[in-house]
Each structure stands twice: as C-alpha cells, then as structure tokens.
Amino acid sequence: MLVVQMPFSFPMAHFILFVFTVSTIFHVQQRLAKIQAMWELPVQIPVLASTSKALGPSQLRGMWTINAIGRLGNQMGEYATLYALAKMNGRPAFIPAQMHSTLAPIFRITLPVLHSATASRIPWQNYHLNDWMEEEYRHIPGEYVRFTGYPCSWTFYHHLRQEILQEFTLHDHVREEAQKFLRGLQVNGSQPGTFVGVHVRRGDYVHVMPKVWKGVVADRRYLQQALDWFRARYSSPIFVVTSNGMAWCRENIDTSHGDVVFAGDGIEGSPAKDFALLTQCNHTIMTIGTFGIWAAYLTGGDTIYLANYTLPDSPFLKIFKPEAAFLPEWTGIAADLSPLLKH
C-alpha cells in the first residue's frame, strides 16, 4: 500500500498541545477534589465491641459514655443509667474498658467497649447526673457526652426493666455454681420451701455512716425483724447470708431456728459468688448500699430494706432520695437512730 506522508503543520501541533494541557488540568483538579473530600471525612473511632450487635453509625451519631467509679453495685447502676439515657436520647453508648472488666466476667452485657486510647482523643462534654431521673435528662445536648456522678436509681431505667434484666443475666457457669450450692441446703433436715438472700453491708460503712453522713448501718434488731417477717409469711424459708463482715453476722444473727446459712466469701474484690447466690434466691433482705439494691432488683420477689437510716439533717439526703432508690413495692423497716442521738 502506498502511504503518502503529509507535512506536520504548525497549527496542528498547537491544537494537540492545547488538548493535552486542558486534559492534564482537568485530571489534576479531580484528584485534588478527592483528596480534599478525604480530609473532610470524620475520624473513624475504633472500638472494641463486647458483642456482635452493631450500633449503625448511619442510625446513631456521636458517642456517649460514663465514668466507671466504685465497685460492682455502683458500676451496675452506671451501666444501666448510660444504657437508658443513651437510648432515650437516640445516641450510641460505649462503656469504659474498666467497666467491662468489672461486669463482663459476671454478666452477659452487650454495650460495646471504648478503648482508653481512643477515649483520650475525644473532646468529651462532661455531664453530671444526680442519683435520680430529671426531666432535663430526656433532652441532653451534645454528640460526645461523658456522664459523671454515681447514678443508681430505678427512675432512670425501670421502664426498660426487661432489657436491664437481660443485660445483667449471669453467665451460665456463675449461675450454675450458685444453684448447686443452694440445692445442697436443708432446713432442719428438710428441703427449703423458700430461699431468702440476705446481704449485710459492713466494712467502711460502719464508720462512714455515723461520722460523715449522720446515719447508721443495720443492727441485730433490724435483721431479727426482717427474718421474722419472712418466717411469718413463708413455710420453711432458709436465709442465705452474705456479707463483707461475716464475723459480725455470725455473732449477731439468731441461728436457733436452724434456717440460717452463712454463705459466700465476702471478698469485695471478687463479688461474683456472693452476688450470684443472692440473685438465685426467691426474695431479698438488704441493709444499705447499691450491692444489695441490685441483688433485690434482679431477684424480684419480696424485698425488705433498712429505711430512715439517717437523721433528717443528714447531708446524705442531698445526694440520695430513698424514694428513687427503693422500689415502691419493697417493704422498709425503720432503723434505730438512738445511737446517733446519744452523741
């Protein structure tokens, strides 16, 4: 084939150079636009989830958490309050790693865990909570909120009772160990008809209540009244006593009926055994403290609690409302305040 070569004209060279330049500028602009868009994307917060349940970021914006303060009862209250308020306000809830370490070995909790390294990079808005529900808590502003305080009131979460009970379901091995112990108990050689968990809070409260809060802890008389209340209403009850002051309990709880068992180990650093025993009973006798409150809440049944255990001018009543701590259907037995009046 004959190929005729035409001379390359100067105007054609200009045209091709123009097309190449325009194309290059266009692609550079497109690339810069993509890079800028990537810079403007929000930082993705890595979390370690303790469950397979995903909180879709397209559905819930921001991140709410709560300070992990206190021992088991306090942290259960903090967890339940965070769970309820986050749901109420349409925000995703994440728990601190410390709280996960306290609760996860005992319960089947589902809230995802926030790494401490990630938490330290977030511009948190601290939000203090009273120990009772307030109307303003239904409309809390802010996407990155960290609750503070010691909330442990049914007024926050009782409308979600079944969900809270599900969150605080015992792991199988924890529950089975407690049930195995209870199955082996007898009352005067017979199988008990009713199991009543008894939690006696002693420890630091013995000194803190009278010296700081103008209050008292449960005494021998209160416990006798509480046990007799159940003896009058149930056939062959057995009382399963747990305490962080078991020596005091052995000296002050009447065992002449043959229906009292001193159980648990009273070790505050590893409370799973005591707590599981209490919740596997049918009813509860508590004294003071969030440990007993939660045991009663999870157990259901009848609950006897120590009522009016501070003087009317106690500073404790500024941060604690009995009506927000004890369910209305629970039965209170008034404390003996005479030791405080002697001083």
Swiss-Prot record:
Catalytic activity, EC: 2.4.1.69, 2.4.1.344
Disulfide bond positions: none
Glycosylation positions in this chain: N188, N282, N308
Cytoplasmic side of membrane: 1-14
GO annotation, biological process: fucosylation; glycolipid metabolic process; oligosaccharide biosynthetic process; protein glycosylation; regulation of cell adhesion; regulation of endothelial cell proliferation
Sequence ranges on the Lumenal membrane side: 29-343
Regions crossing the membrane: 15-28
Reaction(s) this enzyme catalyzes, per UniProt: a beta-D-galactosyl-(1->3)-N-acetyl-beta-D-glucosaminyl derivative + GDP-beta-L-fucose = an alpha-L-Fuc-(1->2)-beta-D-Gal-(1->3)-beta-D-GlcNAc derivative + GDP + H(+); a beta-D-galactosyl-(1->4)-N-acetyl-beta-D-glucosaminyl derivative + GDP-beta-L-fucose = an alpha-L-Fuc-(1->2)-beta-D-Gal-(1->4)-beta-D-GlcNAc derivative + GDP + H(+); a neolactoside nLc4Cer + GDP-beta-L-fucose = a neolactoside IV(2)-alpha-Fuc-nLc4Cer + GDP + H(+); a neolactoside nLc4Cer(d18:1(4E)) + GDP-beta-L-fucose = a neolactoside IV(2)-alpha-Fuc-nLc4Cer(d18:1(4E)) + GDP + H(+)
Pathway entry: Protein modification; protein glycosylation
Alphabetically ordered keywords of this record: Glycoprotein, Glycosyltransferase, Golgi apparatus, Lipid metabolism, Membrane, Signal-anchor, Transferase, Transmembrane, Transmembrane helix
Any GO CC annotation of this UniProt entry: Golgi cisterna membrane
Tree of life domain: Eukaryota
Membrane topology: Single-pass type II membrane protein
Location of this chain's protein in the cell: Golgi apparatus, Golgi stack membrane
InterPro entries: Glyco_trans_11
Matches recorded under Pfam families: Glyco_transf_11 (PF01531)
Annotated GO MF terms: alpha-(1,2)-fucosyltransferase activity; galactoside 2-alpha-L-fucosyltransferase activity
Functional description taken from the UniProt entry: Catalyzes the transfer of L-fucose, from a guanosine diphosphate-beta-L-fucose, to the terminal galactose on both O- and N-linked glycans chains of cell surface glycoproteins and glycolipids and the resulting epitope regulates several processes such as cell-cell interaction including host-microbe interaction, cell surface expression and cell proliferation. Preferentially fucosylates gangliosides GA1 and GM1 in the antrum, cecum and colon and in the female reproductive organs.
Annotated family: Belongs to the glycosyltransferase 11 family.
Protein's UniProt name: Galactoside alpha-(1,2)-fucosyltransferase 2
Native species: Gorilla gorilla gorilla
